Amino acid sequence: VDDAHGVGTMGPRLGGTGQEQGVQDDIDVYFGTFAKSFALIGGFIAADPEIIGFLKYNTRSQIFAKSLPMPLVLGAQKRLEMMRDRPEFKEKLWTIVHALQSGLKNAGLDLGNTNSPVTPVYLKGGPAEASNLVVDLRENYGIFCSVVMYPVVPKGVIILRLIPTAVHTMEDVNYTVKAFSEIQSKLSQGLYDRENYAVGLGS
């Protein structure tokens, strides 16, 4: 199970989607990332010792690979402790997630069928629109989000991925919803077709 979006956000002890569904003990190989709920880099695989041993000696990416720097390992351990000992973080996170996702939906934005804090916003456009749009968001609204384009998604589709956290506020949510309403309006008007639109807007 690749549970990049579930670990640290779902389950009674934030153990992920399997824990949330009550099937964690039935998972043979469990993948997770430190790049989302842990706010770090790297990832992990959890499995029986025999499987881990096989992967260590047979996975090409492991050949000549180095361990994560110790500060990052210690940081991951500390975050894991906080996830287990501070249940209020989960409650705050999901309050923000539900507010953001419902706000975006009420504003007419398409979020698909997300069930995790990672919030995709589906828009229509090509590379030019996507480039101008994300620069506009970053430079003029102060909002950073990753963008997914073809060939990961069909041509003409743009996905912007927002990752709300437990330290965001309702003011952040309201600001983000307003910003996305505005960029959706600009996109529908064809304003992002203009070359260097987003950069020029802030000058």
Predicted features along the sequence, with ranges:
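A short glycine-threonine-serine/GTX helix/turn-capping micro-motif
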Residues: I41-G42, T59-L68
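Catalytic PLP-binding core of fold-type I/II PLP enzymes
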Residues: V1-R13
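Active-site PLP attachment segment
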Residues: Q19-F54
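Conserved PLP-binding catalytic core of the aspartate aminotransferase-like
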Residues: R86-Q101, K105-Y141, Y150-V157, P164-A166, ...
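Short, ordered loop/turn segments at secondary-structure junctions
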Residues: A4-G6, P49, P69, Y150-V152
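Short beta-strand
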Residues: F31, A65-K66, D110-N115
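A common structural junction motif
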Residues: E139-F144, F180-S188
